Design a protein with these regions (language model features):
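C-terminal motif of bacterial Sec signal peptides marking the signal peptidase cleavage site
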Residues: 18-19
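N-terminal cap/lid segment of alpha/beta-hydrolase-fold proteins
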Residues: 34-82
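Short, surface-exposed "cap/lid" segments of acyl-processing enzymes
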Residues: 69-122
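Serine-hydrolase catalytic core
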Residues: 76-81, 221-362, 366-386
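Catalytic nucleophile-loop/oxyanion-hole region of alpha/beta-hydrolase
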Residues: 124-151, 156
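Gly/Ala-rich beta-loop-alpha elbow adjacent to hydrolase catalytic centers
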Residues: 158-163, 167
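Active-site nucleophile loop of the alpha/beta-hydrolase fold
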Residues: 181-192
Length: 390
């Protein structure tokens, strides 16, 4: 059976499609029958139900189902010495709770009850990003904020990329939220053509279809998912445009971010995130007059690092998947002549790491997927939280 489509448009990431495409046969590209339930009355039931859902609906990439489930399932960390407050963390588009595998334990060690949710459409198969509407993502974040708020005496909201959009919009609606932790906030996409993605999603199924070989996230992107992300960015920009946010906010941004407009985000931080206690860590070379902004140079030739990427800020240099010599290496498409087709065959100490597109074409290059300043970043975050706990 053929699915016929005709579209000449450049949405999201410079896509042009015209003609007919075959119905997918790879189960990664065939959606589940429905979304997982997410409005349970309590968090423990949500965890159990989601584990069962993932086991039944996930297209597993390896024979080690437990490792894969542990990577993508929502989780809770209960602190040994509770401080009375909690943190709700929300991942980004195509990602999973694994985005917080390094950050969440640090928060729990500071006494916070930490909960990480799984956005509907994630953790199972790439085609499931065709299923959720923006309301599903908004509703799950709002619902689990309410559940956590019943258990603690104050909630911080944290978000990576698209997750940052969702939690920021919710924080505007709930002035009782203690504050925000934002990692690579995707307030505005770097590609201005992303605004066409909601229209394109009516005609085009996939922004990109790639082999799925990373069990922590999707490599492929369904156009409906791209459109839903864009809607989340439009919503949060409306809130930011309409009013300042005066609660303490901690932000981490890469100057070279290849996915989002980080310059827009830093400008909004200076203009609209007005608390004198707010803080932004800028991973790049620009120095800002705003005293709340600390810059960390990413020109690190001794480490063969050129710049920070969209995903790198949240992962430790010791992360087994994303460290320099980790299980996953995100190779650039263009490599010097003679480079193996899979650049992961090149010893890690011979590879230069950066945001996509950065670096010298004469060098073997890969997307950086860890934060060389991770320990310093966590120290800054912990100090920020301690100073703003009350």
């Amino acid at each position: 059976m053929l699915t016929c489509k005709k579209l000449v448009l450049l949405p999201v990431f410079a896509l042009t499609l015209s003609g007919c495409a075959s119905e997918p046969t790879d189960p990664q590209f065939v959606a589940s029958k429905s979304l997982q339930p997410y409005m349970q009355d309590d968090y423990q039931t949500y965890l159990a139900d989601t584990q069962e859902w993932l086991l039944e609906n996930r297209v597993f990439l390896t024979n080690d189902k437990q490792t894969e489930l542990s990577a993508v399932a929502p989780f809770e960390l209960v602190p040994q010495n509770p401080n009375g407050q909690g943190v709700l963390l929300v991942h980004g588009l195509g990602d999973s709770p694994f985005s917080y595998v390094d950050i969440a334990p640090d928060l729990a060690a500071q006494g916070y009850l930490v909960r990480v949710i799984l956005l509907p459409g994630h953790g199972t198969r790439a085609a499931d990003l065709s299923l959720p509407e923006i309301e599903d993502w908004q509703n799950i974040v709002a619902h689990h904020y309410e559940l956590l708020n019943e258990q603690v005496e104050g909630v911080w909201l944290g978000g990576f990329s698209t997750g940052a959009n969702l939690v920021t919009a919710l924080a505007y609606q709930h002035p009782e939220v203690k504050g925000l932790l934002l990692f690579s906030p995707a307030f505005k996409p770097r590609d201005s053509l992303a605004r066409f993605s909601p229209l394109a999603s009516w005609f085009v199924d996939w922004e990109s279809q790639l082999p799925e070989d990373n069990y922590t996230r999707y490599n492929s992107l369904h156009m409906k998912g791209a459109a839903t992300y864009y809607k989340s960015s439009a919503v949060v920009r409306d809130y930011i445009d309409d009013a300042a946010y005066d609660k303490p906010t901690f932000v981490m941004l890469s100057e070279a971010d290849e996915t989002i407009d980080s310059q827009y985000a830093v400008e909004q931080f200076s203009e609209k995130f007005t608390s004198s206690h707010s803080e932004l860590l800028w991973f790049g070379e620009t120095q800002y007059k705003d005293e709340r902004i600390t810059s960390y140079s990413m020109n690190l030739p001794n480490q063969k690092i050129v710049s920070a990427s969209h995903i790198s800020l949240v992962f430790s240099p010791e992360n087994p998947i994303y460290k320099r010599d980790g299980e996953v290496r995100l190779c650039f498409r263009e490599q010097p002549e003679g480079t193996p087709k899979d650049c992961s065959e090149v010893p890690s100490d011979q590879v230069w790491f950066s945001a996509y597109g950065d670096g010298e074409e004469t060098q073997v290059r890969a997307r950086i997927s860890w934060n060389p300043y991770f320990d310093q970043s966590m120290q800054k975050m912990n100090r920020f939280l301690k100073d703003n706990k009350n």
